[in-house]
Design a protein with these regions (language model features):
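Conserved core of the sugar-phosphate nucleotidyltransferase
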Residues: 1-83
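Conserved alpha/beta core of the MobA/IspD/sugar-nucleotide pyrophosphorylase nucleotidyltransferase superfamily
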Residues: 56-134
Length: 134
């Protein structure tokens, strides 16, 4: 992320990685990213997106909550003050940037991170740390 931020200092950046299992794809605590071929974020949802007509899991991307922002973008975010409409529905703050007209560039990251969205996730992190002898 640091390299991407240095290369694109005027861009709003957000990390993402591939979802490998269907359970994560269907889990509403995992924000799913819909990314254009050029790396722009098209949408992010807690719902299963992209979704096939038949409802089968094919592939998806998840948000890795690592960001880089230019100062002007953070200022605009703060001045906006309240959650935007979609941000409020999905509870995903990066959607505020999309609704304000910012382009969000997604940075592909390792899928080895463990998201911590609720207290039960802390044990998964501790187990991973112990398994590495740290």
């Amino acid at each position: 992320m640091v390299e991407a931020a240095l290369a694109e200092p005027d861009e709003v950046l957000n990390g993402y990685c591939r979802i490998e299992d269907e359970a994560a794809y269907r889990d509403p605590s995992v924000p799913k990213a819909v990314v254009a071929p050029d790396g722009r974020l098209l949408y992010m949802s807690r719902g299963p997106v992209p979704a096939s007509k038949g409802g089968t899991f094919r592939m998806a991307w998840r948000q890795v909550c690592i960001y880089a922002f230019p100062r002007v973008a953070l200022r605009a975010f703060a001045v906006h003050g309240v959650k935007s409409r979609l941000e409020d529905i999905e509870d995903i703050e990066i959607l505020r940037f999309l609704e304000m007209g910012w382009t969000v560039r997604m940075v592909l990251l390792s899928d080895t991170s463990i998201p911590v969205d609720d207290p039960a996730d802390v044990e998964r992190v501790l187990a991973a740390i112990r398994s590495r002898g740290l």
